[in-house]
C-alpha cells in the first residue's frame, strides 16, 4: 500500500509517462539497487541498473524541497506529509484498513494532505483491502452516465447496484 499511496498521490493532474518518470527518478535517488540476472538488461529499455521503490524514510529525508527538486511539483508537500505520517504511525497502510468499514477507511486516508475520496478509494481498491471501494474520476463519471444513467439519477450507492465487489466491477 505504500507504493500505491505514493503512485496515486503522483497521479493527480498527471499522465502515465510523467508518473513513471517521477517514480524512476525517486527510485534512482532513494531506492536500493536491484541485482539483475545475466541477460536481463537487454529487456529493460537500456537500463543497466534498476532501483527499488523508495521507502517512507527516504522520501521524508528529502524533505519538501528535495521532493520538489525531483520534479514532483505541487505533490511534494503531499508526499512529504504521507511519508511523515506513515513513519510516525499516523497513517496505517496495513490490514487495519481492511478491518474497518469503507467510509471509515476513506476518512483515515483523507487525513493525509492531497488524499481525497478518489485517491483514497483507489488505494483501498488496488490494495485489495476494500473491493467495494468505487473510485470515480471524470472517465468513470462519463461511463456511468452513458451506461447506467438511472444509477446517477437516483444517486444510488454503487455497492447497492454492483454488490460488495463494486470496485472490481468497474
PLM regions and their residue ranges:
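HhH-family (HhH-GPD) DNA N-glycosylase catalytic core used in base-excision repair
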Residues: 1-170
Amino acid at each position: 500500500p505504500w507504493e500505491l499511496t505514493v503512485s496515486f498521490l503522483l497521479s493527480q493532474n498527471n499522465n502515465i509517462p510523467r508518473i513513471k518518470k517521477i517514480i524512476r527518478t525517486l527510485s534512482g535517488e532513494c531506492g536500493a539497487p536491484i541485482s539483475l540476472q545475466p541477460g536481463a538488461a537487454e529487456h529493460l529499455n537500456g537500463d543497466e541498473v534498476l532501483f527499488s521503490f523508495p521507502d517512507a524514510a527516504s522520501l521524508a529525508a528529502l524533505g519538501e524541497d528535495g521532493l520538489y527538486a525531483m520534479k514532483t511539483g505541487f505533490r511534494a508537500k503531499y508526499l512529504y506529509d504521507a511519508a511523515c505520517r506513515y513513519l510516525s504511525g499516523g497513517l496505517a497502510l496495513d490490514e487495519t484498513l481492511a478491518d474497518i468499514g469503507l467510509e471509515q477507511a476513506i476518512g483515515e486516508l483523507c487525513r493525509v494532505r492531497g488524499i481525497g475520496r478518489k485517491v483514497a478509494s483507489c488505494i483501498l481498491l488496488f490494495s485489495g483491502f476494500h473491493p467495494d471501494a468505487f473510485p470515480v474520476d471524470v472517465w468513470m463519471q462519463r461511463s456511468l452516465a452513458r451506461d447506467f444513467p438511472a444509477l446517477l439519477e437516483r444517486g444510488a450507492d454503487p455497492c447497492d447496484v454492483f454488490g460488495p465487489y463494486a470496485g472490481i466491477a468497474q
